[in-house]
């Protein structure tokens, strides 16, 4: 078996400080995209991350690449939270609840407009991250339904819409103020998901395919 030489490994494996810089850039970009939107200057992101402009461009050649990495990293963390919830052996609905609250903290809804307007939504990295999240959410919901704890007339799309709407500040309101109420309102919604259902919902359960269908 041929083993890579130290020189080869040095070329192919990023240094620890380079990885830390990349992580700092992604973290700063996520915070600033959430606070100020997609047009925040990259030099401002570099300043918050504590790195030079050249370091930002060395890691991300353009804004689209940085936005994509931010969205994928948020989805990856959301998936990791979902996998932890799936690994729980206790109450299935409580596991779903914990996952929903954790997902809201990621503030992915604030990034959705950037995904829709700045680059290809079908980029392989983005599709893979999105499919992983959707599969995990479906498994969590199916498990709660099988336990008789989640009403049967809701779909993955229903859950995703509400998490997105409740974790995005209403127009004209302060972002920080809204954060104080997100989990309160999410819990109100989650209580309405419990079986048995107390009312009949209009329409049919919303799927992810429904959300991707173009508006007429």
Residue ranges with predicted function:
Residues 24, 44, 94-102, 158-162, ...:
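Amphipathic alpha-helical interaction segments
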Residues 37-38, 58, 151:
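Helix-turn-helix/winged-helix DNA-binding modules
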Residues 1-9, 135-146, 172-216:
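C-terminal peripheral helix-coil segments that are non-catalytic and often amphipathic
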Residues 1-48, 65:
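Basic, helix-initiating cap at the start of DNA-binding domains
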Residues 50-60:
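Short hydrophobic/aromatic patch on the recognition helix
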Residues 69, 76, 80-109, 122-125, ...:
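Hydrophobic alpha-helical connector segments
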Residues 113-123, 204-207:
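Short linear capping/connector segments at secondary-structure termini
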Residues 121-175, 180-184:
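Amphipathic alpha-helical packing segments from all-alpha helical-bundle domains
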